[in-house]
Amino acid sequence: MAAHAEELVLNNTSILNVNMSNVTKLTSTNYLMWSRQVHALFDGYELAGFLDGSTTMPPATIGTDAAPRVNPDYTRWKRQDKLIYSAVLGAISMSVQPAVSRATTAAQIWETLRKIYANPSYGHVTQLRTQLKQWTKGTKTIDDYMQGLVTRFDQLALLGKPMDHDEQVERVLENLPEEYKPVIDQIAAKDTPPTLTEIHERLLNHESKILAVSSATVIPITANAVSHRNTTTTNNNNNGNRNNRYDNRNNNNNSKPWQQSSTNFHPNNNQSKPYLGKCQICGVQGHSAKRCSQLQHFLSSVNSQQPPSPFTPWQPRANLALGSPYSSNNWLLDSGATHHITSDFNNLSLHQPYTGGDDVMVADGSTIPISHTGSTSLSTKSRPLNLHNILYVPNIHKNLISVYRLCNANGVSVEFFPASFQVKDLNTGVPLLQGKTKDELYEWPIASSQPVSLFASPSSKATHSSWHARLGHPAPSILNSVISNYSLSVLNPSHKFLSCSDCLINKSNKVPFSQSTINSTRPLEYIYSDVWSSPILSHDNYRYYVIFVDHFTRYTWLYPLKQKSQVKETFITFKNLLENRFQTRIGTFYSDNGGEFVALWEYFSQHGISHLTSPPHTPEHNGLSERKHRHIVETGLTLLSHASIPKTYWPYAFAVAVYLINRLPTPLLQLESPFQKLFGTSPNYDKLRVFGCACYPWLRPYNQHKLDDKSRQCVFLGYSLTQSAYLCLHLQTSRLYISRHVRFDENCFPFSNYLATLSPVQEQRRESSCVWSPHTTLPTRTPVLPAPSCSDPHHAATPPSSPSAPFRNSQVSSSNLDSSFSSSFPSSPEPTAPRQNGPQPTTQPTQTQTQTHSSQNTSQNNPTNESPSQLAQSLSTPAQSSSSSPSPTTSASSSSTSPTPPSILIHPPPPLAQIVNNNNQAPLNTHSMGTRAKAGIIKPNPKYSLAVSLAAESEPRTAIQALKDERWRNAMGSEINAQIGNHTWDLVPPPPSHVTIVGCRWIFTKKYNSDGSLNRYKARLVAKGYNQRPGLDYAETFSPVIKSTSIRIVLGVAVDRSWPIRQLDVNNAFLQGTLTDDVYMSQPPGFIDKDRPNYVCKLRKALYGLKQAPRAWYVELRNYLLTIGFVNSVSDTSLFVLQRGKSIVYMLVYVDDILITGNDPTLLHNTLDNLSQRFSVKDHEELHYFLGIEAKRVPTGLHLSQRRYILDLLARTNMITAKPVTTPMAPSPKLSLYSGTKLTDPTEYRGIVGSLQYLAFTRPDISYAVNRLSQFMHMPTEEHLQALKRILRYLAGTPNHGIFLKKGNTLSLHAYSDADWAGDKDDYVSTNGYIVYLGHHPISWSSKKQKGVVRSSTEAEYRSVANTSSEMQWICSLLTELGIRLTRPPVIYCDNVGATYLCANPVFHSRMKHIAIDYHFIRNQVQSGALRVVHVSTHDQLADTLTKPLSRTAFQNFASKIGVTRVPPS
């Protein structure tokens, strides 16, 4: 180990500066040896304490507080630690260094690396044990085999899971092949197993014997192979270093890169099997060369020519025929070669002189010297394949590729066929390359590896595969047509494009239908349209896109949509822009009968557009749109697959696909492109690049100082059609740069490695890296259409008129007619909001500041600069064109000075155009008539309330999405201001590495009023409490949640006694709680302090998401309420009672929502004042909407329903227009666990069931159905899903139903209890149900399976009554705490006579003695007079609907009796 230390002197104290420049660098695979080397080195210098933390940091200052002075021990410690920090960091490879970027001391680096690579997790240990089981000798040498095993033994020991010696020996022996059986038998015969060193030595000796035998039987027959010459000479290379057998082999400087042992000889055990091959000497089939009669003659002739000189067993050998020279530019595949060999020095991209004394031996026994060694790469259509340790032999006649080294170094497999071969990815099986044979040899199809060009130079040559990828994977005929007609530079014109695996995977199709007979004579005469729905929601919440295809030119426009209802607005915009541009009108519009197109009928008739539709269920009649869908989707998916980009980026890929499709020739236009047909000029292909490849935009203007990097690796996502630039996504900072100064690496695809290596911490940083400015203008309505303007001075003029160019008198531009979504159709900038007080998010250049690069030489460098290339901006809105387009004078002055920096679009992942669907804004009436709409008088029509889809614009999922909308920005600003005002945290430097730093994220919610109208936008900053560790980051947890029964009881009492009910909301309730633990949190996404970006938040107050936050808030609230006289209920800890004389106040707490009621308005008002003074409380006054429950008070009582929740659920499940049914569950057939076909994806089923469970608050009529379907959540079937949809259909007909708390109620407590004996045919467990009434008010109900199988219906009913009595006993305790006294004992009605008698006396004890004793407590209550059990007829048993599905008549009868009804009229 070449490491030394220099001694520095500071204040007469030595400080060691350790130089570790030659120490083996840490990678992801050698931590074990690296840590031993580094720790031993520092231990030798007595500095190991700085690594393991035993040498602690002294205090920074000493002396008194009044006169502190710097501690010299601290200065020495800090300087020594920094030197060690630098030395250790220098011994870490670049790929690992980001993992320790947050460490500030050497001990933190050491601990971080230990946690990553030596953490004894179950997965890590299991992985190592699995590798040991799979580690077989195979073709490995004994040295390699033993080294792999011992390394894993040591790693397990490092993780604290060592294997004992016997187990290690067993692992070594069991994975050896059959030829080592003698050694295995010898070791097994010993009483005590030998050491691993002894086993290794015996295996080496046996390996030498096997090599000697195999070398004696191998005949030097001419073959195209490079192998290791094997003789009877014993391999002595291992003797010299046998004591260091388990050292790191990377440090063995004496070994050469190609010094490896030969493939093991496997004897043929089946001697009776005839030899079917052809003799290599005489050419006769049926015997091998070893048994040929001409063998002796052949050997003598070979020996007479030139006797071979002695050589070592590891000497490289080339068994090739020295015939006519073969072109040195061609590579030949050789399955027997162990090393790559080349005679062309240009084939080595990285090389070094060879200083060894070994030569390559050829078939005639002569040797050829080795001049250099190096490496290169061979390109394929998906990724380059690397060739390492190539031997450069000038005098050899062929370039040989070792199949073994090719497969092992690149993770591929090679399949040989009689006339061709294929190279496939080993993991996915996807073909990477296909080649053919030539002169009976397997020749690599590419002559040599091509250097990767990082420049966007039109003169750079590319292969057919590269052009195929650049042009979006077109058909081979189209590809050849483009290359031929436009004279594109191709690296090897004679080599024709064969196939593309990405195309084969994504472009499978059916037989086409017949062609349409419609003929068009001009653009826009026929427009075909259709909507496509994506199964995957994009990052910007796009679910659909709509296309418009011009029949005459086949030109396509694409707009992404969030809702299908946006089609009408989109088409109107599309029609106005195109008709104004081309000075012609749309004649006929062809589509299917979708509702989004039906909504356009009136508009079509008003504007004279003929609307043709396809017959029902016949999409083939809209074949042009359907085929265009297939073309777009296949091309887009192929682009994503080729670049390994997640499918959530489909709008970008589809936009680029349409951009390329419009520029590719099509046979329908006689190999003319739609672009050329529409604009009369040829497209420009020079600036096309491979979608998703690595790119390097010029980013100098964004550097903070002159030493920053001028560029960063980004991902190419498309073409900006409003600027002369490309779209470049930087993955680490999640910024989308728009730049014209870009260099490309078209063989590298960053996404393929980025997502796999993204850690949770990096994901948090990625979300937090968003920068935002309140002055940044964002588009408010942006379809995916390009829109440059002809008048824009940044773009070239319109193309010269051409005889074949239609509309040549119209200055037509093209860019906006493409479907690159980047910033198409940007609307006018939103007015800048005034800056609020308080902290603001980190800023970004505004739109004016972030104009794209200089417009100099746009005709040369614009990727979309095809003469008519400015239609995109000319088709943009007038406000945008006038505001954002600079004047010619300004443009000239700006471009003549210095280029402006590239624009930044803020979004991780890249943003699509923001669509703001404001359903609350009606069109402005310009006529003079006075209307209700002008006066703001709007009365909704109730008969249409159920036909309106309430799935409005969805809430954003990330801070990046929310920052695009001013309303969400304001909500986020309010939340941050509240946190700052409450002094929730302090910004501090990061704590030590062993302290958990909790992440945080934003939660966005729309708050609605009881009528469904929008109340406000709410943004909540929550901590990622799931990262907290119990006992370290928190101790106890509790959430103040009032029981639903308590709510119904208190509301029933308040309604009956005409008390006011007030609703409160505590602002930032969890912030009121004080933390007793030290909790550190990362800075909020979008609001990172630009001066201290690496600091973290040390929480002083609780925050939503923390494990201890609910309990901290509850303790704070409870302590205060107790000080002002409230008493905390024992029955329900979230209920508080204040009583002063005859005045009483009840308070119900559900986290931060509070209900308060009482009989004394003065006391109630004083209580509200006290709460407002202590907490930030929002008083909603009278109860109207609480926890998603709509409360409507009428003179006769209070109606509770969940109408809004039901409608949202129906809209989310697309069931709002479903045909209603009268019962939630059919009585037959009965559902079973195994009925129907199992769902492949149960996610939807489970989500709907979970949503329905919340409806039980006001809907006892669906309790049984929901409970029954909940029992199948672990394995739902299609039949269960249909039953679930039946509940939704029932709710669609009864969304306004709920429970009615009637005024003038008698406060008597009674309940109905029932059981369905053995009703479940899967396990024969009974179902019990009950419903409890306080007077006429239903206050509690349940439908639940019993715990076990019962022997009779009486036992089932008896258990049900016992459970009901438990609930009633709790209710009685709660009523007592509320000050309510019952005038008579509670009553339970049961329809089973035996169970009724059993509750009163033990007459059936002999038949019921197996019942658990705890069920018999009901007898004590009955005998003491605290409870009565009364028999009731089955016809009057109201709990019957809670235990089984009923017929329509019976269900409707019971539903009305149990209290589920519509809201009574006022």
From Swiss-Prot:
Identify the keywords attached in UniProt to this record, alphabetized. Answer: Aspartyl protease, DNA integration, DNA recombination, Endonuclease, Hydrolase, Magnesium, Metal-binding, Nuclease, Protease, Transferase, Zinc, Zinc-finger
What is a GO molecular function of this protein?
RNA-directed DNA polymerase activity
Q: List the biased-composition ranges (Polar residues).
A: 255-270, 915-927
Report whether Protease shows up as a keyword of the record.
Answer: yes
Q: Which residues form the signal peptide?
A: none
Please report the stretch or stretches of sequence annotated as the Integrase catalytic domain.
519-682
Q: Which reaction does it catalyse?
A: DNA(n) + a 2'-deoxyribonucleoside 5'-triphosphate = DNA(n+1) + diphosphate
Q: Which domain of life is it from?
A: Eukaryota
* Domain Reverse transcriptase Ty1/copia-type, residue spans: 982-1225
Region: Disordered, residue numbers: 227-270, 772-927
ZnF bounds (CCHC-type): 278-294
Cross-referenced CDD domains, in alphabetical order?
A: RNase_HI_RT_Ty1 (cd09272)
* Catalytic activity, EC: 3.4.23.-, 2.7.7.49
Q: Name one Pfam family in it.
A: gag_pre-integrs
Residues annotated as binding Mg(2+) are 530, 592
Q: What is this protein called?
A: Retrovirus-related Pol polyprotein from transposon RE1
Q: Which organism is it from?
A: Arabidopsis thaliana (Mouse-ear cress)
